[in-house]
Curated annotation (Swiss-Prot):
GO cellular component assignments: Holliday junction resolvase complex; nucleus
InterPro entries the record matches: DNA_pol_lamdba_lyase_dom_sf, EME1/EME2_C, ERCC4_domain, Galactose-bd-like_sf, Mus81, Restrct_endonuc-II-like, WH-like_DNA-bd_sf, WH_MUS81
Gene for this chain: MUS81
Keyword DNA-binding applies: no
Sequence ranges of Polar residues compositional bias: 298-310
Region of interest called Disordered, as start-end residue ranges on this chain: 298-318
Subcellular location(s) of the protein: Nucleus
Function in brief: Interacts with EME1 to form a DNA structure-specific endonuclease with substrate preference for branched DNA structures with a 5'-end at the branch nick. Typical substrates include 3'-flap structures, D-loops, replication forks and nicked Holliday junctions. May be required in mitosis for the processing of stalled or collapsed replication fork intermediates. May be required in meiosis for the repair of meiosis-specific double strand breaks subsequent to single-end invasion (SEI).
Complex and partners: Interacts with EME1.
Protein name, per record: Crossover junction endonuclease MUS81
Pfam families: ERCC4, MUS81-like_WH
Amino acid sequence: MLPDNLKDLYVQWLQELIDSLSEKQEQLINTYSKAKKNLIDHDGVFYYPKDLLKVKGIGATIAKRLEARLVKHCEEIGVDVPRKQLPIDNGTQGSKSLKRVRTQLRIDGINTNDTDINKPVRKKRKYIPKKRSGAYAILLALLELGAQNKGVIKPDIIEAAQKYTDHSMTPNYTTKEFYSAWSSIAQLKKHELVLIEGRPQQYTLTEEGLQLADTLRLADGIDIDGKSIASSMDTNNAYYSDEHTADFSALKHDLSGLTCAPIKDGTNSSGNYSILEKTFGSQDFNVRHHEIGMVQRSHTFGNGDSNNSIEPLPRDTSEFTTQPSLIQRRRFESVSYELWQPGTYEIYPVIDHREVRSHSDREFFFNAFKARDMKSEIRQLSLGDIIWVAKNKTTGQQCILNTIIERKRLDDLAMSIRDNRFMEQKNRLEKSGCKHKYYLIEETIGSSIGNMADALKTTLWIILVYYRFSMIRTVNAEDSVDKLHALHTVICESYKHKALVVLYPTDLKSQDHYRGILSIFQNEFERSGNLECCHTFDTFQDIMGKRELKTIKEITIHILMLVRGVSLEKAVFIQRHFPTLNHLLNAYRKCNSQMEAKLMMFQKFGNAPGAKKITKQLSEKLAETFAF
C-alpha cells in the first residue's frame, strides 16, 4: 500500500538519478540537485507525478522520469499506479465543465478513450489546391501531358501549366523575382500527389493525384483533349517519330564479327560504319534475322556474287532519309537519342543571371549582345557563366554545345584561389564534357589583390599548360563583349553543316556518369567531323549543379578542404590513403601521444611532390581538427 504522501520517495528517486550520472554530466547533476532541494523545501502533499510540476525546477522531463520510477515501484510491491480520478458528472455540470475535465485529463496524461467521455477524432482535411495557384496549374498540366503513364520533365510542365495559373511559373532574376509558382511542386510531393523519379527528374501523377486533377478539370469545366495524351507522350512530342525500342548496341555486337562481300564499284569497305548510319539510314530499319543474313559470317572477304553484296551506307548526314518535320529517336547503350539535322536548330549563348557588369547594370551583356543583333538568354546556370546552346526550331528543345566560359576579374580570380573555389570550379568544368573550355580573364581590378600577384601568374600558366583550358584576356567588360561576339560568329559557322546527336538519359547517377555516357557516344558517332554528341540543357542543369548527391569519397574530400590550408590537391592525396573519415579517425586513435598525432600527416606526406606536400604546421592543424 502506498503512503498518502510520496514526497520522500520522489526525493529518494531524484537522488538515485543524480548518483547514476557521470562526472562529465555536471550540468545535469546541478539541475537534478536543484530540483531535489526545491522539492525538500516545498510544503504540501505529493501523491500523483503531475503534482511535482508545481515545484520550481521540476519540468516535464524530470516528472516523466519520476513517473516511470513510480510505475516500476508499484509493480515491485504489487499495487496500482496512482491515477487522478474523473470528477463525477451528475448532470449539473455544463459543457464548459466537461471541457475543463478533458483539459485536465490531457494535462494529467490520462487516456480519455478509457473513460465515458468520447473525444471526437478530427478528420484530416483533404488537400485541394486553390484555383489558379501553382499547384493547381501543375496538376492540370500533368493531366494534359499524360503524366499518369510516363514521366514528364520540368520544362514541359512549366510550358503547359502557365495558362492555368495567374502567377509566373519561372523566376525572373532581372527583377529579383527568385521564386515562382513552380515551388508548389513541394506541396504536391508532400501530399503524395506527384511522384518524382530519375535523373534528370521526371514527374508522374500518382493515383490520388490523377483523381484530384481530373476532379479539378471537371469542376472548372476545363477542356483537355479527350484522347489519351499518353499516346503523344510516348513520342515526347507530336513531331517525334515512334522510338525504336531495340537497343542498337546489341546490333553492333552482332555485326562486330561479320564481314561484307566486295562492293561492286571496288571501293574499300572496312565494315566500320557507325551505328548512326545503321539506325538512321532508313526509317524502316529493323533488326531481323533475315536482314542480318545480308552479310557473310566470315573473318575474310569472300568472293560471293553480286546478290550477296551490299551497298555502302551514306557518310554524309545530309544523305540520311529523314523528313524535315519528323525527328527520329533511337537507342544506343540503352540511352535514347535524336538526330538534329543542320539548319533545324539555332545557336545562341545563355548567360548566368549572376553575371553582371555592376549592381546597377545587371543586364549589360544581354543588352550589349542585343545591340549587335545577337540573340542571348539569361538563365540560372548550374555551371559556368556563359554557355552556348542549340534550340530546335520545331520542338523548342535545347541542348548543350561544346563551348563553356568561366568569366573572372583578376581580383575575383585571386579570391577564388585563396578560398579553393578555383580548383572546385575547374574540376566541375572538366566533368561537363565540353571540349572547348574558356577562362575569360578581365584585367580590371575591383579590389586590391594584395600579395597574390605571383599566385595569379602561376594560376594563369596552370590554366593554359597543365589543365589545357583556353584563355581569353580582355581589358574590360566592353572588350569582353567584342571577343564573345567574335567567338559566337565562329561557333555558328562551325555548326552550319553539322548534325547533332542529342542524348536523353533517364537515370544518371553522378556527374562522372553524365560525362561517361557522353564519351561513349562521342567515340561511336564522332568519327567524322560532321556530327556532334551533346546532352540536353535540362540534363546539364540537373546534373552539373553543386547540389548533386555526393559519394563518400567526395564528401571526405569536401570535409578535408574545410580545414584552412588544405587545397583540392592535398585533400585528394589524403583521401587516397584514408578513403573515408573513419579510416582517418582510426589512424589518429592509434597514435600513442598527442605529439605523434600532430606529426602523423607530416611524416606520411611531408615529402609529397608539389602542391600535395603537407607541412608540419598543417599537420598539427589537421590533428587539432580530427584527433583532439
